[in-house]
Regions:
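N-terminal helix initiation/capping motif
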Residues: 1-40, 106-115
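PAS and PAS-like sensory/regulatory domains
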Residues: 72-74, 90
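Short strand-loop-strand
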Residues: 20-60, 91-93
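Short, charged beta-turn/beta-strand-edge "cap" motif at the junction between a beta-strand
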Residues: 65-69
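Short beta-strand-centered aromatic/proline hotspots
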Residues: 33-35, 74-81
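Residue-level preference for beta-strand/loop junctions
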Residues: 16, 29, 55-57, 70, ...
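C-terminal structural segments of small proteins and small subunits
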Residues: 81-108
Length: 115
């Protein structure tokens, strides 16, 4: 049987398409850059930036969402990179340091306001 597999077949957590903005900063705080999240899940995200960030780079994201009072702060690591003309698309694996962050991310994924 040759059924087409869904895109999330290799992920532990499904992703949802989003159109959210974020500020990405390097883990050591040496720079901050704007980004646009393309998809988001409990385990990570795909985003576009104007410049490439190497695989293995520790980053922090401050995600803006219409229904949140404050940005959602997430920590992670760049796990893949595709260079585009004038931009870069990258994948991030999240490291949830607290249940509060995970709970807020779950609420964000359940909300309809950001679609």
């Amino acid at each position: 049987m040759n059924a087409k597999r869904p895109l999330d077949h290799f992920r532990a957590f499904a992703r949802r398409p989003v159109g959210l903005t974020a500020i990405v900063s390097r883990g050591d705080g040496s720079w901050k850059r704007p980004a646009r999240l393309l998809d988001l899940g409990l385990g990570g995200a795909c985003m576009e930036m104007l410049e490439a960030v190497p695989n293995g780079t520790a980053i922090s994201l401050a995600v803006e969402a219409p229904h949140l009072w404050d940005p959602l702060f997430l920590e992670g690591e760049v796990v893949w990179l595709h260079s585009l003309e004038g931009a870069a698309r990258l994948g991030v694996r999240f490291y949830h340091r607290s249940g509060r962050t995970l709970r807020t991310l779950t609420e964000l994924l359940e909300a309809e306001a950001y679609h």
